[in-house]
Amino acid sequence: MSSSFQTIALIGKHKNPGIVTPLSSLARYLQSRNLTVLLDNLTAASMDEDSYPAVAMEEIGSRADLAIVLGGDGTMLNIARKLAPFNVPLVGINQGRLGFLTDLSIVTMQQTLGAILEGRYITEQRMLLYAEVARSNVTTFGGLALNDVAVNRGIGGNMIEFEVRINDEYVCLLRSDGLIVATPTGSTAYALSAGGPILHPSLDLVALVPVSPHTLSNRPIVVGPDAAVEILMQRTAVARVHFDSHSHFDLEENDKVMVRRSPHRVTLLHPSDHSYYRMLREKLGWSGLPRNPT
């Protein structure tokens, strides 16, 4: 059966020797199906592989019909942000531990990928956030986030103080260790550990989750996808804004962090038997079996 995916990019966790054997095996498998295989530059360098074209991420974005990512959720987050502007579908393969984004097992990857290449898969669209930092009314930093944009105290031990506005309307003055602005994808990450709600990934919603607030009545709130969230730094010694915990920018008093929904989306492909609720049970350790199994 012919596949709608003809050019496949393989991307692995960088500087991880454990990716070499499975990625080489996967590349040979894809080539045996008469598909064109691309490696991103850093993956090719880690594999010491010259049998396949090694290209920059921008070229993967312009040429690939599908990107297969081998690693953990952190690797997937990084690649998803880079490829989001190109709308390249992503498949995530974990290295033994099930991830929220990397749900294919490395043990059965060829069989599962074979089904996906033949059109048996579930497509899922995930929203992204875009945030900018303004200092003296000049934008000094910006970036995408698939999980969350988080303002936190830095290496110092003091709480930070900031004002929160939504769509130019004042919400509150918050004294806490920080604030997490999370997507549904990020609702099962840092935001969950801070007491935030779990949002189904099919929803376009944003959760605002305080981190250790000084006033216990400061609770998480959920807002619509078109909400423009502004965080205005007040008295703060050391604070940072983090994008998916990968990149960060140091904040100063009177800096403004502006968070909005990005026009870009991430497309994930899952096996046809994928179940979000089963994944929640397995990842979060929910116990118990149904009393009346169907």
From Swiss-Prot:
Q: Which GO terms describe its cellular component?
A: cytoplasm
**Xref: InterPro entries:** ATP-NAD_kinase_N, ATP-NAD_kinase_PpnK-typ_C, NAD/diacylglycerol_kinase_sf, NADK
- What keywords are assigned to this protein? ATP-binding, Cytoplasm, Kinase, NAD, NADP, Nucleotide-binding, Transferase
Q: Which GO terms describe its biological process?
A: NAD metabolic process; NADP biosynthetic process
Instruction: State which Enzyme Commission number(s) the record gives.
Output: 2.7.1.23
Q: Where in the cell is it found?
A: Cytoplasm
Instruction: Please state the protein's primary subcellular location.
Output: cytoplasm
> What positions does UniProt annotate as the active site of this protein?
D73 (proton acceptor)
Q: Which domain of life is it from?
A: Bacteria
Enumerate the Pfam families for this protein: NAD_kinase (PF01513), NAD_kinase_C (PF20143)
Q: Could you state a single Gene Ontology molecular function term?
A: NAD+ kinase activity
Q: Where does NAD(+) bind?
A: D73, G74, N147, D148, R175, D177, T188, A189, Y190, A191, L192, S193
| Catalytically driven reaction(s) | NAD(+) + ATP = ADP + NADP(+) + H(+)
**EC top class, as a word:** transferase
Similarity-based family: Belongs to the NAD kinase family.
Q: Which NCBIfam families match?
A: PRK01231.1, PRK02155.1
Q: Per its database record, what is this protein's job?
A: Involved in the regulation of the intracellular balance of NAD and NADP, and is a key enzyme in the biosynthesis of NADP. Catalyzes specifically the phosphorylation on 2'-hydroxyl of the adenosine moiety of NAD to yield NADP.
Q: This chain belongs to which protein, by name?
A: NAD kinase
Q: Which organism is it from?
A: Nitrosospira multiformis (strain ATCC 25196 / NCIMB 11849 / C 71)
Q: What is the lineage of its organism?
A: Bacteria, Pseudomonadati, Pseudomonadota, Betaproteobacteria, Nitrosomonadales
